[in-house]
Curated annotation (Swiss-Prot):
The presence of a 'disulfide through disulfide knot' structurally defines this protein as a knottin. Pfam families: Albumin_I, Albumin_I_a. The keyword S-adenosyl-L-methionine does not apply. PA1b binds to basic 7S globulin (BG) and stimulates its phosphorylation activity. Involved in the signal transduction system to regulate the growth and differentiation as a hormone peptide. Toxic to various insects through binding to a high affinity binding site in the insect gut. Transmembrane segments: none annotated. Keywords: Disulfide bond, Knottin, Seed storage protein, Signal, Storage protein, Toxin. The C-terminal glycine may be removed from PA1b. InterPro entries: Albumin_I, Albumin_I_a. It comes from Pisum sativum. This is Albumin-1 E. Disulfide bonds join 29-46, 33-48, 41-58. GO terms for molecular function: nutrient reservoir activity; toxin activity. Residues 1-26 form the signal peptide.
Length: 130
C-alpha cells in the first residue's frame, strides 16, 4: 500500500516538475505596454492589447486575445469592423508589425493626423478596401 502511495507521489512530482521547467524560459507577458513598442512587451512572444490609443496590457496570443478585439469598440481589422461597431469609417493600423489590428477613426485623414503626432506618416498602413 505504501509503495502505491509513493509511486503516485513520484508521478505527481515528475508531472509538476515537467510543467515548471517548460515555463522557465518562457517570456513574461504581464504588465503595461504601448502598441508602438517593438517588440511589444519586450518579447515577440507577447502581444500588446490596447485599452486606449497609446496604452495597453501584455498578454500571450490566444483565443481570448482575439475575442477582446470583437468586444472593444475601437479595435479593428478592417474598415468594415469600424462601420459595424459604429466607431468610425477607417481602420488605421498601428505601425507595429506585431499588432494585427488597428484603431477606428472617422476618416483616413484623422488617423494620419493622430499617428503623425506619434510616429512618421509613412508607417501608417491602410487596409482600406474602398
Amino acid at each position: 500500500m505504501a509503495s502505491v502511495k509513493l509511486a503516485s507521489l513520484i508521478v505527481l512530482f515528475a508531472t509538476l516538475g515537467m510543467f515548471l521547467t517548460k515555463n522557465v524560459g518562457a517570456a513574461s507577458c504581464n504588465g503595461v505596454c504601448s502598441p508602438f513598442e517593438m517588440p511589444p512587451c519586450g518579447s515577440s512572444a507577447c502581444r500588446c492589447i490596447p485599452v486606449g490609443l497609446l496604452i495597453g496590457y501584455c498578454r500571450n496570443p490566444s483565443g481570448v486575445f482575439l475575442k477582446g478585439n470583437d468586444e472593444h469598440p475601437n479595435l479593428c481589422e478592417s474598415d468594415a469592423d469600424c462601420k459595424k461597431k459604429g466607431s468610425g469609417n477607417f481602420c488605421g493600423h498601428y505601425p507595429n508589425p506585431d499588432i494585427e489590428y488597428g484603431w477606428c477613426f472617422a476618416s483616413k485623414s484623422e488617423a494620419e493626423d493622430v499617428f503623425s503626432k506619434i510616429t512618421p506618416k509613412d508607417l501608417l498602413k491602410s487596409v482600406s478596401t474602398a
